[in-house]
Every structure is written in structure tokens, then in C-alpha cells.
């Protein structure tokens, strides 16, 4: 039994030892396993079943098809996830950004092309993709060409281990927590390459700022997330989500879920702030900073390359929202609606917060940004981790 389960049972006034003595060790163990399996299923986790396994069973090939079919089903799942989040990035991301910003600033957003202005995305895509990809003479061509693909690729790779709903997780490795942060950090290489390869001072400064910012905030981001792992006792994301399906406390007949945002709200605030800097949104958008660096590392890009970098930004915003939802908001767990719907609602809620910050909070200077990361968030994240470890050790 993990420390967090002990905490939940204590909060609900449950005495695990008495229950074990009354029922017998074996029976209590079986009952606990059954309850956990039921909670995991209700929370939309599906007991850790992956999408290839789900698709194989639906098509009548059983839970363990041969490696060739597993590869095919995995590619189908990867295509589905990529399609869902590319569409989300295009419509909820780019169109939503305009609508939300207009609402916060009391303006009228796009409303001419299609219903509610939705077809402006199609118009923008046709306009940008029909433009010539201009390659300046002095660029480092291989790095210049590769960089735009690394940014969206790293985000889509990170979604591979995110539990999106019942049977909608492409892979469920034991080290899924480590994998998702490692995959998302590949984007830093793409941003630096795009800035360096452009042979442009503004682009180079934007790339350096992006790298410095990601290093400064990646450490507190991971350290803060590690406090969730200390509580959960596992690195497997599906198990972290399943653990949040239990009731933390029941007040007047209303059960408060054991989401880690309620267990450790300080860690949630730290993680949300570090994530905001990690995805480069206001007030931490110094790598682009239009008033200072034109378009930062994207200055020399046009046409399809610009589209890839721009979509990559929004994909990373949604990946950050998915990580927040998985670690702190119960992932796909929720009543009545399917797990995938709850997951998208939570991701969009985090996205709404980033757009509020973009409209309401002014940009900080690069020196202030680095100071906040190294002297503020890093210290608080380690303090949070140590305090969490002490509490868990005391409970256990």
C-alpha cells in the first residue's frame, strides 16, 4: 500500500489494520485489489490497457496479437492521436487564442469566415502553405530544414504515454513519467537549431533565450512533478491516474476526489507556473518577444516551415496541459462523460489559463525570467519535494 493510500484512508477515518484483522489478510488483499481495479475502470484508465491491445480485441485478434499486428495497430493509434491533437492545436489553439484574447480585451475576434469564424483556420492554412519556403543563402541548410520538424514531433511523441481514456493510451511503460518529460525536452534542441542555423542575430538570440529558459524551468518542473511520484510510489502514468480515482474525503455526503491538486496545492501552483515558462507563454515568452526580437527563432522561416513551428508551439501547450491533467487533475477520471471527453476538458481548462496569463500579465525581462527560475522556483520546488518526502515518510 502506497503512502497516499494510507493518507486517503486516514482522511476518511478508515482503519486499514482493523479491516485486515476482521476480514483476514488474504480477503482484505483481494478486496483492495478489486476496489482498485473498479476505481481504475471508473476513472477511464482501463486498467492500463493500451490502444493497440484495445483495437486488437475489437477486431477479434485477442489481447496479444503477433508483433506485426501490434506494430500496425500502434501506427494506427499514433495517427489517431496525432490527428486529434493537430486538429485541437489548429482550431481550439489558434482560433481559440484569437477568441479568448478578444474576450479578455473587450474586442471582436474573427467572425467573418464560416460560422463563428472557424474557417479562418482553413484560410490561414491555404495562405501559408501556398507560400514559397524562402531559404536565405547564408543558413546552415541541414539544421535549418530539420529544426521545424523536431518541435511538433517531440510533442506528439510525448502524447504516446499520456492516458487519454479507457484503452486510449498508446504505450504504458513503467517509466512513463520520465519518458514524457524526456520527449518534450527534445523541442529545446529544435528551437536552438532553428535560431543558430538561421544565421540571423534576432533568430540566434531567440534560440539562446529559448534554451536558457527551458534549462532554468525544466529542473523545477521535473522536481515538482517528482513530489507526485513520491506520493504515488510509481512512475507509471496509468497508475498515478488510477490512484486519483479514490475519494480523498467525504463531507456531507459529497466525496472530494483524491486529485493531487487537493493533496498538494502548493506543488500544483509551482508546476503550473513552471509549465507556463516551459511552453513559452506570457509572461515568459521572451524567446519570441515581438517588440525585441521580431519573431525570435522563427524570424527567417516562412511557408510550411513556419506552420510546423507555429503548430509545434500549440502542441506543446496542449502537451503541458495533458501532463498537468494527468499528474494533478485525475487525468481522464470523471463522472458520466467518457474519459477522453474529461481529458480534453481539463486540457482546454489549462489552455484557457495560459491565454488568460497571455492577456493579463505583462512580459518579464529575460534577466528577471532567469532569476525567477533559478532563485525562486528551483528553491521552492526542492523545498516542496523534501517536505513531501518527510510527510510521506511520517505517514508510512
Question: Residue locations for each model-derived region?
Answer:
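Asparagine/serine/threonine-enriched low-complexity, disordered tracts
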Residues: 9-41
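Selective transmembrane helix interface/packing segments
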Residues: 2-12, 40-396
Amino acid at each position: 500500500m502506497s503512502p497516499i493510500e494510507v493518507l486517503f484512508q486516514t482522511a476518511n477515518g478508515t482503519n486499514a489494520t482493523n479491516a485486515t484483522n476482521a476480514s483476514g489478510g488474504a480477503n482484505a488483499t483481494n478486496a483492495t485489489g478489486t476496489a482498485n481495479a473498479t476505481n481504475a475502470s471508473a476513472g477511464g484508465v482501463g486498467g492500463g490497457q493500451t490502444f493497440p491491445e484495445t483495437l486488437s480485441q475489437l477486431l477479434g485478434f485477442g489481447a496479444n496479437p503477433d508483433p506485426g499486428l501490434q506494430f500496425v495497430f500502434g501506427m494506427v493509434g499514433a495517427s489517431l492521436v496525432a490527428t486529434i491533437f493537430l486538429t485541437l492545436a489548429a482550431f481550439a489553439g489558434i482560433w481559440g487564442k484569437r477568441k479568448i484574447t478578444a474576450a479578455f480585451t473587450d474586442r471582436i475576434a474573427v467572425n467573418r469566415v464560416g460560422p463563428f469564424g472557424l474557417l479562418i483556420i482553413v484560410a490561414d492554412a491555404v495562405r501559408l502553405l501556398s507560400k514559397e519556403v524562402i531559404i536565405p543563402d547564408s543558413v546552415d541548410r541541414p539544421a535549418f530544414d530539420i529544426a521545424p520538424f523536431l518541435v511538433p514531433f517531440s510533442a506528439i511523441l510525448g502524447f504516446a504515454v499520456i492516458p487519454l481514456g479507457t484503452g486510449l493510451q498508446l504505450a504504458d511503460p513503467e517509466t512513463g513519467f520520465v519518458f514524457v518529460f524526456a520527449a518534450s525536452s527534445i523541442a529545446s534542441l529544435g528551437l536552438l537549431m532553428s535560431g543558430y542555423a538561421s544565421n540571423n542575430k534576432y533568430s540566434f538570440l531567440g534560440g539562446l533565450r529559448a534554451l536558457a529558459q527551458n534549462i532554468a524551468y525544466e529542473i523545477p518542473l521535473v522536481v515538482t512533478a517528482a513530489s507526485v511520484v513520491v506520493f504515488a510510489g510509481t512512475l507509471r502514468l496509468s497508475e498515478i491516474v488510477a490512484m486519483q480515482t479514490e475519494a480523498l474525503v467525504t463531507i456531507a455526503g459529497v466525496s472530494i476526489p483524491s486529485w493531487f491538486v487537493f493533496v498538494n496545492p502548493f506543488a500544483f501552483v509551482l508546476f503550473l507556473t513552471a509549465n507556463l515558462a516551459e511552453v513559452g507563454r506570457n509572461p515568459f515568452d521572451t524567446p519570441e518577444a515581438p517588440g525585441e526580437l521580431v519573431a525570435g527563432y522563427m524570424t527567417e522561416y516562412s511557408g510550411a516551415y513556419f506552420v510546423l513551428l507555429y503548430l509545434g508551439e500549440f502542441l506543446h501547450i496542449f502537451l503541458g496541459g495533458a501532463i498537468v491533467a494527468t499528474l494533478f487533475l485525475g487525468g481522464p477520471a470523471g463522472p458520466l462523460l467518457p474519459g477522453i471527453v474529461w481529458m480534453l476538458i481539463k486540457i482546454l481548462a489549462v489552455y484557457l489559463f495560459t491565454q488568460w496569463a497571455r492577456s493579463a500579465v505583462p512580459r518579464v525581462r529575460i534577466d528577471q525570467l532567469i532569476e525567477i527560475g533559478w532563485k525562486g522556483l528551483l528553491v521552492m520546488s526542492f523545498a516542496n519535494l523534501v517536505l513531501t518526502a518527510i510527510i510521506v515518510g511520517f505517514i508510512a
